[in-house]
């Protein structure tokens, strides 16, 4: 993370751990005019939360830029809401000596200093620019806000995967329209078409960061999206402001597709969910609780050569009526991705009250159903 203090003309490289700590500090130079950038050509450096978008290493005026520059995402969504204009704001080198406040709006530091940290300046690196800032960690008053926004983000993701009308309530429609440059209604209609066309969605977020800007906050996070038709990942940023009722609402967003490396975290979370589901399923079977047992299955589920809940119920009533279960054991479960959701395999040992027992490999396919999973197919192979 980078931070620029315009008053002191200082550039900080920060480690985003708790507490925030300064890794390196360098002199820099910013815009010739003081104040926050408002329009193209005003020679001011913008103030807010920005992110590195790329890297330029050639074709530059060496005296002005050296041979290295990192473009920022100015104007960001909140800047557009506020009517700010302009662009071409970079963090760049300087091929000659510089004095304070001599750029046309960019942030410049000596070329050797910039090159010494360039390996840390990947796309998506946060850059906080302020008239004056404290680099001694987040103020205590900000911690509750960060927790609030973590909760808001988790609920937003949950409402998205539930395809709920509540998903759209997380947005401030007028501001979002200005920020994105397209009507909110178009965004809504596109999402509703997807909701209607897919039997399920999964939205998993991780590696969440929360940053404070001038009268707005940014949550930045890795996102993994799954549906029967698509699996994608990337880095997303949501811009939040409070509405007139004091509720946090999303006013803008940015997304960079790519490998967010969230699949291992997603699979670990799903293994935990499946483990909890299997234990409840096992207990329902062991106790011969037919209604609880059937609740784990999709109405059209297939169980070996039986199709549908009625056939499954008839079979279990027959077996349990003659010889109730004594215990069911599950060992070595594995969970893998499947086009319908997840495929689960485990070693199953069954014991009945009359002394009968068997052992085999069970395979289940689970499909997302609301906040949980439903069994859509189940098969069992005895051990030879």
Please give the residue ranges for each predicted region:
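N-terminal post-signal-peptidase region of extra-cytosolic proteins
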Residues: 1, 25-41, 46-56, 71, ...
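Intrinsically disordered, low-complexity
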Residues: 1-37, 126-148, 265-266
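Short, solvent-exposed aromatic-acidic interface loops
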Residues: 27-33, 91-94, 224-225, 251-263, ...
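Exported/periplasmic cell-wall-interacting domains
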Residues: 42-47, 56-154
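Surface-exposed, charged secondary-structure patches
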Residues: 44, 189-237, 314-363
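Short, low-complexity N-terminal intrinsically disordered segments enriched in polar/charged residues
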Residues: 129-162, 254-287, 292-295
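Short, well-ordered alpha-helical segments enriched in acidic and aromatic residues
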Residues: 162-179, 284-300, 304, 310
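Short beta-strand edge/turn micro-motifs at domain boundaries
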Residues: 233-268, 343, 359-384
């Amino acid at each position: 993370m980078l931070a620029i203090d315009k008053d002191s003309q200082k550039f900080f490289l920060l480690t985003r751990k708790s507490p925030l700590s300064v890794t390196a500090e360098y002199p820099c130079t910013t815009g010739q005019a003081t104040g926050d950038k408002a329009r193209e050509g005003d020679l001011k450096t913008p103030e807010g939360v920005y992110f590195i978008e790329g890297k330029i290493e050639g074709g530059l005026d060496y005296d002005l830029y050296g041979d290295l520059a990192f473009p920022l995402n100015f104007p960001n969504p909140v800047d557009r809401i506020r009517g700010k204009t302009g662009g071409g704001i970079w963090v760049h080198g300087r091929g000659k000596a510089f004095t304070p406040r001599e750029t046309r709006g960019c942030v410049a530091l000596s070329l050797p200093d910039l090159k010494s940290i360039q390996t840390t300046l990947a796309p998506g690196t946060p850059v906080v620019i302020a008239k004056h800032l404290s680099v001694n960690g987040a103020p205590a008053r900000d911690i509750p806000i960060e927790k609030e926004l973590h909760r808001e983000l988790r609920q937003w993701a949950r409402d998205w995967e539930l395809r709920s009308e509540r998903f759209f309530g997380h947005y401030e429609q007028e501001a979002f329209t200005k920020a994105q440059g397209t009507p909110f209604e178009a965004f809504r209609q596109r999402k509703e078409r997807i909701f209607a066309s897919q039997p399920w969605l999964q939205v998993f977020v991780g590696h969440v960061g929360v940053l404070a800007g001038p009268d707005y906050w940014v949550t930045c996070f890795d996102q993994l999206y799954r549906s029967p038709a698509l699996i994608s990942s990337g880095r997303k940023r949501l811009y939040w402001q409070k509405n007139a009722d004091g509720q946090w609402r999303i006013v803008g967003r940015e997304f960079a597709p790519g490998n967010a490396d969230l699949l291992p975290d997603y699979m670990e979370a799903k293994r935990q969910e499946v483990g909890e589901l299997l234990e409840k399923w096992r207990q329902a079977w062991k106790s011969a609780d037919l209604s609880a047992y059937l609740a784990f299955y999709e109405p059209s589920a297939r169980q070996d050569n039986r199709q549908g809940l009625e056939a499954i119920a008839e079979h279990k009533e027959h077996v349990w009526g003659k010889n109730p279960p004594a215990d069911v054991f599950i060992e070595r479960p594995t969970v893998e991705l499947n086009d319908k959701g997840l495929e689960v395999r485990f070693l199953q040992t069954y014991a009945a009250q009359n002394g009968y027992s068997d052992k085999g490999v069970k395979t289940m396919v689970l499909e997302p159903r609301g906040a949980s999973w439903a069994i859509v197919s189940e098969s069992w192979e005895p051990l030879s």
